[in-house]
């Protein structure tokens, strides 16, 4: 395991950028992209999208090609985020699935479902954990995250503690300094999203909390876009840097409503149960809490605000 949070956490953010690009950018770009055809959507029922962040080092300066090195020839779903999209009410609900979760009757963590490179295995595991049907998935990587954040002109976040983590793209350390309302570029945002070891308690839960802050900033930035050139570039980055089974035409049609009702968009975010312990092999694991997940998903599926159902960790 790397000394810092597994790099896939950054991919969580890029995947969310991808979703938001589809929700916010299609409306303005539909007349400017020959390759994107909108499809009429008759029903506006809520649906679920799974955002998957791969921790593969391929394409980065940290890639060695050695099977003995972490996340070289295999990969893990180290960011797993379930998003409920409610087009009728202009609502997005973001639920983090802790990567160390172990489902009942299984011995491996849920992030191991991506080892063979099939995101549908991760989708299946999350469906079993949460009890909801997932319509689509989006999977992405490090460099895509950095490219999209840079294309957005950066994202503003509150940094609770100074962090220093290697940027996988360059293998060089990047420092993000504590402070409120800081605009981070792609490299800095990646570092902020990855940092875990710097926090004393509930390290991965704190990382998830930081990531949700980052993603909310990204969402608002994308939904508020007014430059056609920026939107077009974000869409190009989306298509080039993600793997997905999403019907972009249908999602684009729905996006027109979101774009026209930007001020009405409601964004909820929360974490799934993350309390865990060290197992016999010395690994941190989170045993799936079926009752807690059921309580959480009942609120999410009904369109309610799930924040606080699972208490957030203390701010570092």
Predicted segments — roles?
Residues 1-316:
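Non-catalytic, solvent-exposed segments at the cell envelope interface
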